[in-house]
Design a protein with these regions (language model features):
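Accessory, solvent-exposed terminal regions and/or long lumenal/extracellular loops of proteins
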Residues: 252, 256-311, 315-320
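Short, Gly/Pro- and small/polar-rich lid/capping loops
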Residues: 1-22, 295-315
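Short, conserved catalytic/metal-binding motifs centered on acidic residues
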Residues: 17, 142, 326
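Substrate-recognition/cap regions that form aromatic- and gly/pro-loop-enriched pockets
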Residues: 302-349
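Second-shell loop/turn segments in exported
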Residues: 118, 128-135
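A contiguous strand-loop segment
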Residues: 3-125, 145-273, 283
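Short, well-structured alpha-helical segments that form the helix of a local strand-helix-strand
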Residues: 142-151, 289-293
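Short, charged, surface-exposed loops that flank catalytic or proteolytic processing sites
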Residues: 135-141
Length: 349
């Protein structure tokens, strides 16, 4: 079995739902996330603001980047997952919500294409989410923090970062290397992701970044390696980020089943695989999102006819690997924002 396929199979469990503020019953963005990592325990920490000395730098064990520290880092709530076996934690499993009401949850998109000359064993990995929480006052500023760090130091995995505040929700999708793209979820839209890239068309005329950010080499890089060729030379309107950068192996049964299940629960029918978002057919509340993150896969009833011991968690959104489920309910007053949390599986809450 290839290294890429093994990695995809290991991390194809998480789910994230985002509801735009005009599609939400609360009038603010809603975020729901199931974090799936086997044999983990979850700890929640409150980290205060910290002032730093001039010239101070920060490093992380999973990368070689030496990152200049800012004068002051913001306070945040840190949901940390740590393994029950061995030493250390799950470095790509943690989530954050800071004192300004900026929340970060992520989903693996393991399987991005990368050339031999761009393989990153160092750069930034786990550090990215924490640095966003420490440095951003808004979701948009969080995207800009992530973009600057990935451009300078490179990113060593493939991941979707969901960076949200009460008014805006952004999806920042990083590839292995120095490329990334970010798209804003529309205020009247609903978004779901299992573990694949979901950003497709990029509006390269959006130089004011109302809805998109992108790396300088985003299009040229896959062109150099034969992953994308424009139909008309010099016209990149047919560029599709997910298709250019994503391995087909991510279209596995686990991802496909969760996509079908989530979209059916949310809008009444499955959506094409790798859909980014759709116009919300109704307004969604906390209870709607709880129902989705608790969902077991649709064929379970049929399986029970053949095997009464069949687990409902195999290909569901709520799985036997789910370590923590979170729903973030933003409020106009950040002190009244609420994080609903279940340990471990949400179907038990």
């Amino acid at each position: 079995m290839s290294e890429v396929k093994q990695e995809i199979m290991q991390f194809d469990n998480c789910s994230t739902i985002i509801v735009g503020k005009h599609a939400s019953k609360t009038g603010h963005v809603l975020v729901a996330h199931n974090e799936d990592d086997m044999e983990c325990i979850t700890q929640v920490h409150l980290v205060p603001r910290v002032k730093h000395e001039e010239g101070e730098v920060i490093t992380f064990k999973d990368g070689s980047a030496v990152i200049p520290q800012v004068p002051e880092t913001w306070a945040y709530m840190w949901t940390e997952l740590r393994t029950l076996k061995g030493i250390g934690g799950e470095p790509f499993a943690d989530s954050y919500c800071n004192e300004w009401g900026v929340a970060i949850v992520t989903d693996s998109c393991v399987g991005s294409k990368v050339s031999e000359d761009e393989k990153m064993k160092d750069g930034i990995g786990y550090a990215l989410r924490r640095l966003i929480a420490e440095r951003a006052k808004t979701a948009r500023e969080g995207v800009e923090v992530a973009a600057a760090l990935c451009s300078e130091f490179g990113y060593r995995s493939s991941r979707a970062y969901h960076i949200c505040d009460k008014d805006e929700a952004w999806v920042f999708q990083a590839t292995t290397g120095h490329n990334y793209v970010a798209q804003r979820v529309g205020d009247d839209e609903i978004y779901y992701i299992p573990n694949w890239y979901t950003i497709h068309k990029v509006d390269f005329t959006d130089t004011e970044h109302k809805n998109f950010y992108w790396s300088e080499d985003l299009v040229a890089y896959p062109m150099r390696h034969g992953w994308y060729t424009p139909a008309v030379e010099g016209d990149y309107s047919d560029f599709d980020f997910a298709l250019a950068y994503q391995h087909d192996l991510t279209l596995g049964k686990s991802n496909a089943d969760r996509s079908d299940l989530a979209w059916t629960k949310l809008v009444g029918e499955p959506m094409p695989y790798r859909t980014f978002s759709v116009k919300a057919p109704k307004k969604y509340g906390i209870e709607d999102l709880k129902e989705v993150v608790r969902s077991h896969y649709m064929e379970h009833g049929d399986d029970l006819k053949e095997d009464p011991t069949m687990s409902p968690h195999r290909f569901g959104i709520c799985r036997d690997t789910t370590s923590v489920s979170e729903i973030i309910e933003f409020h106009e007053d950040v002190n009244l924002s609420c994080c609903w949390r279940s340990f471990p599986r949400p179907c038990a809450a």
